[in-house]
Amino acid sequence: MSEAEARPTNFIRQIIDEDLASGKHTTVHTRFPPEPNGYLHIGHAKSICLNFGIAQDYKGQCNLRFDDTNPVKEDIEYVDSIKNDVEWLGFHWSGNVRYSSDYFDQLHAYAIELINKGLAYVDELTPEQIREYRGTLTKPGKNSPYRDRSVEENLPLFEKMRTGGFEEGKACLRAKIDMASPFIVMRDPVLYRIKFAEHHQTGNKWCIYPMYDFTHCISDALEGITHSLCTLEFQDNRRLYDWVLDNITIPVHPRQYEFSRLNLEYTVMSKRKLNLLVTDKHVEGWDDPRMPTISGLRRRGYTAASIREFCKRIGVTKQDNTIEMASLESCIREDLNENAPRAMAVIDPVKLVIENYQGEGEMVTMPNHPNKPEMGSRQVPFSGEIWIDRADFREEANKQYKRLVLGKEVRLRNAYVIKAERVEKDAEGNITTIFCTYDADTLSKDPADGRKVKGVIHWVSAAHALPVEIRLYDRLFSVPNPGAADDFLSVINPESLVIKQGFAEPSLKDAVAGKAFQFEREGYFCLDSRHSTAEKPVFNRTVGLRDTWAKVGE
């Protein structure tokens, strides 16, 4: 497959191909412009993969630019987190990290240019009055009484704003466009507002800050962006994007193109709702493994490759749609099935004693991956007392049950065939110990007499077991579209986190955060980066071996 054939195809790439073929552009320059007021989520990953991926494929450039125009909500913590997420996903920005605040002097000069052209004015309506005057989708707006101020009036008033002569909310700079426009965004939008807040990049130099719609297009032009890619909610804003660039003296006029944002089942993407989950302690933080944040997915065990593959599969369109959670889960499941070494862990343990087993124990050889001999093998201790999962034993069962049953045989993974002889129970009737016998001639081979033993279960030697905490993470919400609920918090899945105390094979004591394993017959797990200790490792379930929600949705 050629490089061109391997590239994804979508309407944006078709536009770029046409622009390059026609000579409109000789190179491609994109940007990823997050606001540093929160953590990136899987929706941002789509934009990252699109913008950086296009730059890679066309041998162009992609800038990382922080839209840092609201110092009240922004923090250097988010700047650092976003940079880390972009790099973790496997991308590298062109040149230095950029900030919209780098252009505050130029933006201020362009605002003065608009004032001098009679295209901007200082308004002293209150924010509430501005909203009232703006009108609705069915009702046109009305002009502010300050709209017809002269250039000679507006220039000193704007300077008064800049030097702190107005209180917050007492004045703003607005574009002078059309209060009767069918597009509300064009009804004299605010260009600058007053905020007495220290900025994480510029300190206290400024007390006026430009709005996103004024900043975004000028920053694109100053950086030579050729294709400014936004999600569909900014479609109407394109008119303002073009209006600003058409009315200032700037040599470059980028074009904005919109694509559908990512909507994913069983979660929410709204920053406000995600923040509520964190602040109300429904989750333990922005990196909670149930969160759709990149940091949460990473802590859960998702790989950068699986997220890139997911973004590739869902594609880029102009049609809003909701993606099944199963699509994301299948990407990580396929990745880890191929690449994760195998290990054994018992999540709900019950003791099993092999009464005729002689000696202290032995080592059995196990492949690290059943289909990849190049991944090698490991030695796992075996002994006469082991832990098995409680779900792998029944006193009575039908023929469909292929695990251990009283009076019947089963194979222990890569070890011996055993037969359940009797059980011991506590006062409440719970099985505490299963007593078995084993066939000593069946170590990793079939019984000599030819009898068939169909079931295979995993196990951990009790004498060598590593005590572990196992966190069974599941979907955070119990309905596909929690955002549509009257109270999205009311549909949080009460089983989204189940904590178990289990045992694992001793090799897992050397596990490191970010390294995934398939716990045989259980699912894919990784060491938790926050709660694990040397004395008590904590493993997070990344995803099960199969989609257990499939039947729920039918």
Swiss-Prot record:
Annotated coiled-coil segments of the chain: none
Gene3D superfamilies: Glutamyl-trna Synthetase, Domain 2, Glutamyl-tRNA Synthetase, Domain 3, HUPs, Ribosomal Protein L25, Chain P
Reaction it catalyzes: tRNA(Gln) + L-glutamine + ATP = L-glutaminyl-tRNA(Gln) + AMP + diphosphate
Residues given in the record as ATP binding sites: 35-37, 41-47, 231, 261-262, 269-271
GO cellular component: cytosol
GO molecular function (one): ATP binding
Residues annotated to bind L-glutamine: 67, 212
GO BP terms in the entry: glutaminyl-tRNA aminoacylation; glutamyl-tRNA aminoacylation
Chain location of the short sequence motif 'KMSKS' region per the record: 268-272
Entry keyword set: Aminoacyl-tRNA synthetase, ATP-binding, Cytoplasm, Ligase, Nucleotide-binding, Protein biosynthesis
Motif ('HIGH' region): 34-44
Alphabetized InterPro entries for the sequence: aa-tRNA-synth_I_CS, Gln-tRNA-synth, Gln/Glu-tRNA_Ligase, Gln_tRNA_ligase_bac, Glu/Gln-tRNA-synth, Glu/Gln-tRNA-synth_Ib_cat-dom, Glu/Gln-tRNA-synth_Ib_codon-bd, Glu_tRNA_lig_a-bdl
Enzyme Commission code: 6.1.1.18
Transmembrane portions of the chain: none
Subcellular location as annotated: Cytoplasm
Alphabetized Pfam families for the sequence: tRNA-synt_1c, tRNA-synt_1c_C, tRNA-synt_1c_C2
Positions of the UniProt region annotated as Interaction with tRNA: 317-324
Family indicated by similarity: Belongs to the class-I aminoacyl-tRNA synthetase family.
Description of how the protein assembles with itself and partners: Monomer.
Protein name: Glutamine--tRNA ligase
Encoding gene, per UniProt annotation: glnS
